[in-house]
């Protein structure tokens, strides 16, 4: 029997458990997505100096709570970055980008001293990419050329109709990739001309994962 009646209750529990891993005061990097939204609603407790947002949606939610949102160009480093994931494995490698904010998420995470990932256990996987497609942000004019390259890597790219990123680009969701070496594949896809970035977060993995399971909260680190 689960401690939580719904998936949302699991997400709320993970968000609450993450607070102790985040700095009080200071500037926090904040990701995007349904789990992060639960966390954002708790952030006033931390009395942050400010936050750097990974998307316009996150920035808007932070501002509604009275939290100042600053441009990343004015920040040298962040004490922590907190975000969810579409998938995460025991190496703390992740697939992200279901909400199409992957590029800004990756940029903000890159200047953080630690990456706190908050998920429910449905996102914990043995191998990335089996159940969730890999999002790739692409400059619009390169969409078809990039898709052909992704096919040559063994993937089945699908154009995410009607979605334009905050950067004005499009998303290809790549199914059936065999992600055995996440670091190498992240590099390979990022080197395709026209790719802005892809949703593998392996070069800069999570520091700790806060995982809500049926039995409660587990804190996991790379194995």
UniProtKB/Swiss-Prot annotation:
The keyword Nucleus does not apply. CDD domains: RPI_A (cd01398). It catalyses: aldehydo-D-ribose 5-phosphate = D-ribulose 5-phosphate. The keyword Metal-binding does not apply. GO terms for molecular function: ribose-5-phosphate isomerase activity. The active site is at 105 (proton acceptor). SUPFAM superfamilies: D-ribose-5-phosphate isomerase (RpiA), lid domain, NagB/RpiA/CoA transferase-like. Coiled coil: none annotated. GO terms for biological process: D-ribose metabolic process; pentose-phosphate shunt, non-oxidative branch. InterPro entries: NagB/RpiA_transferase-like, Ribose5P_isomerase_typA_subgr, Ribose5P_isomerase_type_A. HAMAP family: Rib_5P_isom_A. This is Ribose-5-phosphate isomerase A.
């Amino acid at each position: 029997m689960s401690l939580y009646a719904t998936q949302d209750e699991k997400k709320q529990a993970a968000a609450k458990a993450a607070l102790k891993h985040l700095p009080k005061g200071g500037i926090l990097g904040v990701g995007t997505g349904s789990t992060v939204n639960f966390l954002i609603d708790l952030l006033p407790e931390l009395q942050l100096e400010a936050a750097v947002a990974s998307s316009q949606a996150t920035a808007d939610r932070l501002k509604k709570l009275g939290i100042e949102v600053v441009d990343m160009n004015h920040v040298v480093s962040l004490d922590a970055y907190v975000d969810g994931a579409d998938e995460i494995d025991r190496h703390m490698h992740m697939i992200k980008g279901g909400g199409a904010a992957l590029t800004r998420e990756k940029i903000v995470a890159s200047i953080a001293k630690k990456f706190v990932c908050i998920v429910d256990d449905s996102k914990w996987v043995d191998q990335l990419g089996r159940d969730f497609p890999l999002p790739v942000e692409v400059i619009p004019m390169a969409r078809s050329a990039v898709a052909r390259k992704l096919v040559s890597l063994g993937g089945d790219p699908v154009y995410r109709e009607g979605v334009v990123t905050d950067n004005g680009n499009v998303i290809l969701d790549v199914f059936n990739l065999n992600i055995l070496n996440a670091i190498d594949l992240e590099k390979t896809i990022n080197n395709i001309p026209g790719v802005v970035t892809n949703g593998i977060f392996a070069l800069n993995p999570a520091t700790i994962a806060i995982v809500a399971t049926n039995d409660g909260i587990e804190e996991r680190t790379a194995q």
